[in-house]
Each structure stands twice: as C-alpha cells, then as structure tokens.
Regions:
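A conserved nucleotide-sugar
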Residues: 1-3
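A structural motif corresponding to the C-terminal lobe/cap of the Radical SAM core domain
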Residues: 5-183, 198-208, 215
Length: 304
C-alpha cells in the first residue's frame, strides 16, 4: 500500500477530510503551531487560535494519523513565560512528533521588512555567504545562550513527556477503522522499539511504551508489524514461550510473512524444537539468514 505524509494548517482540517486522507494512505500530518503565546503567533502572522490547534491535533490522532507539531523559539518577546506557554499548549495537544526551530528571518516576510528598517540593511546582504539570519542576532533583548537554553528546555521536556502522550492516544471508535488504527499504533510502536525514539536519551524506557502500543494494536486488529515487533521483544527477553505464542498467532493471520516465520523459527530453536524450526525455515531458504539457521537445525538434528 502507498503511504504518504502531508503538511497542513490547523484551521483547514475536519473529521471527514482526515478520515478520507487516512483511508488513502496518509500516516502523518505536520502542523505549524509555532508557539503557545498568542502574542508571538500574532507577530509571526499565524492566523490561528488555541482552540483550532487543540481541535486539529485531536481530530488527526483520532483518525489514526500521527500529528506532528512545528515549534519556533527565539521569537520577538520570547521569555521564560512564553516558553512555558508553549510547554503548556504542548501538554494539551500531545503531539506524537515535534520539531523545534530557531526563528530565522527570510525575505518576503514582515520580520524581514522590519529587520531592514531597524538595521538599515538592504537585500545586498544575500550577496554574502550566509544561509540565514537568526532573529535573535538582531534583537538586543535576546542572546545566543538564552535562546539555545530555550531550545533545550523545549526538546527535553517534550521527549520526557512523549511516552505518556503515546500511551494516552484516543482513537475514533469506528469498527471499520480498526485495521488502520492498528497499523498506526504498531508504526508508532516501532519508532519506540527500534527507531528514533529508541535512541533518544531523554525518553525513558522506550521499549515499555513500544510494548503497550504493540499490544493495543493487536487488541484492535491483526497487524503483522505488531506481531513481529512484540514477538522479537519477547524473544530478546528470553520469554520463549510467550514469543512463540505471539509469533504463531501472527503467522496464522499472515502465513506468507517471511519475517514472522523466521522469527518464530528462531524461537522454536531457542526452545530446542529444531524440527519445527526447520519446517519453517525450509520455505525461506532463499534468505541467507534462513539458510544459516536451517544449517544449525540440520546439524542439531543429526547430532540427536
């Protein structure tokens, strides 16, 4: 199936549109939230309000689409209070992905025209070798150390809260959407299990969150990714019997899934059942890994 991602404004989405987007393969929508401070959003010409932000994020996640937020810091008037306002809004909307940028000044914006008026700079500045103009470098009320500290606070707080956000996902109660919801949850689980969130030091015990999401996915509908991820997790913990149960159920639902079959074969090997493992591996021997484990099984069977 084709999957795709989108960028949208919080004041342009509705439940019906999001439902059709999800059915068409949309798995993520990014929204420019920018700040929890209404004053800063006004300065940035963001014609959105808090209620629109809350509604868009709730509807997007409810449809089984990952809602990602873009935040900007180092804006005019940025302070500890405005950063706290952003953290408060973040806690309300609970984005499952977030990117934090330092505010840059670009041509064609009101900030750029204001910058030229304040400094006497002309468009010739772009004849220099430069990628951007960070706003804080032009505002004596801000300094680099302060702005960088704001960024660290936003990122660290977000990632420390993220497991709670993932565990409290509220999905639409639509039986027809259950397979799509299961896909959404298992996809997010994989990010905690083996993806970016698994490697982020500010996220505590990402594997525990991954397990919650895998199991919740399987409570909704059979999902190959969830069966495999949960089975691998249990296998890694040496809970062989539980991994066999999960993977065998997965293979029953997805009999042609080579990854589940290979993982189940390894669990049978760990349990000492080399004949059962070999029966699973023989159809997969085009895969070098399957050939390797099949060889081990044959050797073990000869020795017995």
């Amino acid at each position: 199936a084709i999957t795709w991602q989108a960028i949208s404004k919080v004041n342009t989405v509705d439940a019906e549109t999001l439902a059709w987007m999800r059915r068409a393969g949309c798995i993520q929508i990014s929204y420019g939230v920018e700040s929890g401070s209404e004053d800063i959003r006004t300065l940035l010409c963001k014609d959105i309000d808090q209620d629109q932000v809350r509604r868009a994020f709730a509807l997007t996640v409810g449809a089984g689409i990952l809602a990602r937020a873009y935040f900007i810091y180092g804006s005019p008037g940025e302070s500890a209070a405005t950063i706290q306002a952003t953290l408060d809004l973040m806690e309300e909307i609970q984005p499952l992905g977030a990117i934090f940028y330092i505010l840059d000044i670009f041509p064609g914006t009101a900030l750029y025209e204001d910058f030229k008026r304040r400094t006497g700079t002309t468009d010739d500045i772009w004849l220099e070798r430069r990628e951007d103009i960070p706003y804080f470098e032009t505002d004596p009320a801000l300094d680099a150390a302060q702005v960088l500290a704001f960024g660290r606070t936003l990122r660290q707080t977000y990632h420390r809260r993220l497991p709670a956000y993932a565990r409290s996902i509220r999905l639409n109660d639509d039986p027809a959407s259950r397979p799509l919801h299961a896909d959404f949850l298992s996809r997010l689980a994989l990010t905690f299990h083996r993806g970016d969130y698994a490697r982020n030091e500010d996220i505590q015990d990402p594997e525990a969150t991954a397990e919650v999401l895998y199991r919740r996915a399987l409570d909704l509908a059979p999902d190959a990714r969830a069966y495999l991820g949960l089975g691998q997790m249990l296998q890694h913990r040496r809970d062989t019997a539980a991994s066999i149960d999960v993977l065998a159920a997965g293979l029953k639902h997805f009999p042609g899934d080579g990854a589940i079959g290979l993982c189940l074969a390894i669990s049978w090997m760990n349990a000492g059942h080399f004949r059962r493992a070999l029966d699973l591996l023989i159809p997969l021997e085009a895969d070098p890994r399957a050939r390797h484990f099949a060889g081990i099984c044959r050797q073990a069977l000869r020795e017995t």
